[in-house]
Amino acid sequence: LTRGELGTRGTPEIRDQESASAAEVMGVKIRENLGFKDGFFQNDEEHQLEVIKIIRKYKPKIVLCNAKDDRHIDHPKGADLVSDACFLSGLEKIKTKLDGKTQQSWRPLNVYHYIQWKNSSPDFLVDISGFENIKMNAIKCYSSQFYDPKSKESETLISKKNFLDTIFNRSLDLGRLIGVDHAEGFTSNKIVGVESINDLI
């Protein structure tokens, strides 16, 4: 949504490079940034329409977005903005154009939210055992934000020495709850269903 220009550490240009590196680690084929104003974007018509254009462009069945309740004010704002845009994107009477072409309405089937700073109770857990190192390597691409004893920039809560350990340990603990090595938790605005009880672990 933003380029993180208000971040205490690093610059938007550094963040662009870090994002590209993280995308490569994860095998992401396409990454776009809407360039909203960091800290000041709103969940309003102007911003919703820009998100709707992206939803209609890619037609995702599942959308993952920020935590609904979090320390950083942009995270819940982003969560509400994307969630609302996902609903509105399905309304035929909302007209949008991209590259001069009229877009068709599209509503994702599900919107799920990450667990970020706060230890929110997950609505479901995904077994990520075997992928935990890829996750951590992708996160470490954003090195300007994390612990660096040589850095001259101000310390933040996520630049403390043990921060990355807390991320790894959370996936260990969530994995423990479902009997696997590592798990990732998500929250949902609606009840999550499965096609078969055999899908549950």
Segments from the language model and where they lie:
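Active-site rim/loop-helix segments in enzyme catalytic domains that contact anionic ligands
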Residues: 1-58, 187, 198-199
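Metal-dependent de-N-acetylase/amidase catalytic core
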Residues: 45-201
